[in-house]
């Protein structure tokens, strides 16, 4: 119309949907709970601070107790028995939570899927626990920080996902930092054991597979968290109990831990309880603040865990730990940033072409059109 003001609208702008998402997030029907504690009526900042405090407090105790258990003389061969006890605790915690909530929802995920999840969970936690007996604890934590590498491969193979260049840059940075950290550890640790590296590497492979299988199963069947915990750890407990019974390691583990009940079962209870509660809080943090922010918080927690490990448990230190650890942190930052940036390989090609033309002082290439569509009304 003549004389009317024209307004420019950006098609595909993320801000167009921002209010709709905000209204949905603030709807009264959406409950935010950590176990039996309702956080729905707190504002977003308070929810974030409470979740952060819980993550740091619980996982710092978790890491401390895990390393403390392996300081017990003679406990090193019993990492798998510790996993068996941990599975029993997790199953009990999940059953108690489900009973208190009085949930009568039938099982959502097929038993065949749970059988696979239990096997992968057993591999992840059993191999990870066993590696503590052979590796410097900070090295084990650094390996676990680099979970993105096998997860990236697993998501492509299992779910057929496509990833941008930032994800691959992040994985490359993590690989480099991991190699440098391991080399530094082998130089300062007189009892450096390659078998520990082998164990934690297998644990990461299982972790990558379980993350993708679990995500796919929970997305398709919409199973509650406590159901996944009960069946995954319950079936895993049966697997491991049968294997250890047939191999004779179950009797040996029971006999050893009977001599040190507080240092084994008592510490394992705190170790398992803090781990179980920590999982619930991380899931709540993901639900309220998003996965990138949750990844940032858990990464900061791991950095503090490594620092406290050097404080509470005497071990040699080299400045190479710091530099290689910072490279890993940079890789994690790139991974978090990739969730917000939709950079593609085509974008990289255009950027490289622009830089190439600028260096050679060539005229700019003709743009086939702006990526942002404009509509004038």
Curated annotation (Swiss-Prot):
Pfam families, per database record: UAA
Transmembrane segments: 50-70, 77-97, 115-135, 138-158, 164-184, 195-215, 228-248, 266-286, 293-313, 317-337
Membrane topology of the entry: Multi-pass membrane protein
Keywords: Developmental protein, Golgi apparatus, Membrane, Transmembrane, Transmembrane helix, Transport
Cellular component terms per the entry's GO annotation: endoplasmic reticulum membrane; Golgi apparatus; Golgi membrane
Major location (coarse): Golgi
Gene Ontology molecular function: 3'-phosphoadenosine 5'-phosphosulfate transmembrane transporter activity
Alphabetical list of InterPro entries matching this protein: SCL35B1-4/HUT1
An individual GO BP term: 3'-phosphoadenosine 5'-phosphosulfate transport
Protein location: Golgi apparatus membrane
Top-rank taxon, per record: Eukaryota
Family in the record: Belongs to the nucleotide-sugar transporter family. SLC35B subfamily.
Function: Mediates the transport of adenosine 3'-phospho 5'-phosphosulfate (PAPS), from cytosol into Golgi. PAPS is a universal sulfuryl donor for sulfation events that take place in the Golgi. Essential for viability. Involved in glycosaminoglycan synthesis and the subsequent signaling. May be involved in hh and dpp signaling by controlling the sulfation of heparan sulfate (HS).
The protein's name: Adenosine 3'-phospho 5'-phosphosulfate transporter 2
Species name: Anopheles gambiae
């Amino acid at each position: 119309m003549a004389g009317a003001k024209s307004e420019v609208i950006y098609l595909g702008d993320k801000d167009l949907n921002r209010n709709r998402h905000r209204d949905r997030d603030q709807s009264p029907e959406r409950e935010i709970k950590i176990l039996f504690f309702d956080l729905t009526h707190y504002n977003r900042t308070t929810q974030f601070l409470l979740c952060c405090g819980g993550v740091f407090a619980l996982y710092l105790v978790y890491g401390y107790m895990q390393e403390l258990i392996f300081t017990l003389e003679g406990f090193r061969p019993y990492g798998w028995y510790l996993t068996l006890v941990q599975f029993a605790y997790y199953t009990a915690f999940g059953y108690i939570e489900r009973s208190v909530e009085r949930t009568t929802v039938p099982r959502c995920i097929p038993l065949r899927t749970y059988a696979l999840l239990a096997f992968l969970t057993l591999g992840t936690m059993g191999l990870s626990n066993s590696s503590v007996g052979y590796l410097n604890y900070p090295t084990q934590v650094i390996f676990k920080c680099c979970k993105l590498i096998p997860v990236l491969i697993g998501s492509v193979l299992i779910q057929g996902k496509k990833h941008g260049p930032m994800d691959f840059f992040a994985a490359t940075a993590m690989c480099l930092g991991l190699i440098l950290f391991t080399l530094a550890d082998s130089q300062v640790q007189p009892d450096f054991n390659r078998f520990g590296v082998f164990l934690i590497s297998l644990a990461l492979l299982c972790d990558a597979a379980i993350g993708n299988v679990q995500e796919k199963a929970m997305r398709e069947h919409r199973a509650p968290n406590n159901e996944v915990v009960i069946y995954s750890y319950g079936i895993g407990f049966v697997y491991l109990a049968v294997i250890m019974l047939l191999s004779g390691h179950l009797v040996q583990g029971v006999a050893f831990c009977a001599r040190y009940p507080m240092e084994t079962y008592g510490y394992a209870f705190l170790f398992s309880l803090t781990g179980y509660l920590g999982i619930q809080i991380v899931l709540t943090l993901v639900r309220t603040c998003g996965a990138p922010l949750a990844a940032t918080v858990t990464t900061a927690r791991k950095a503090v865990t490594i620092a406290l490990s050097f404080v509470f448990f005497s071990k040699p230190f080299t400045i190479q730990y710091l530099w290689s650890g910072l490279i890993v942190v940079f890789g994690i930052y790139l991974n978090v940033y990739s969730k917000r940036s939709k950079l593609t390989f085509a974008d990289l090609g255009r950027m490289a072409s622009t830089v190439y033309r600028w260096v050679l002082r060539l005229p700019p290439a003709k743009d086939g059109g702006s990526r942002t569509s404009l509509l004038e009304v």
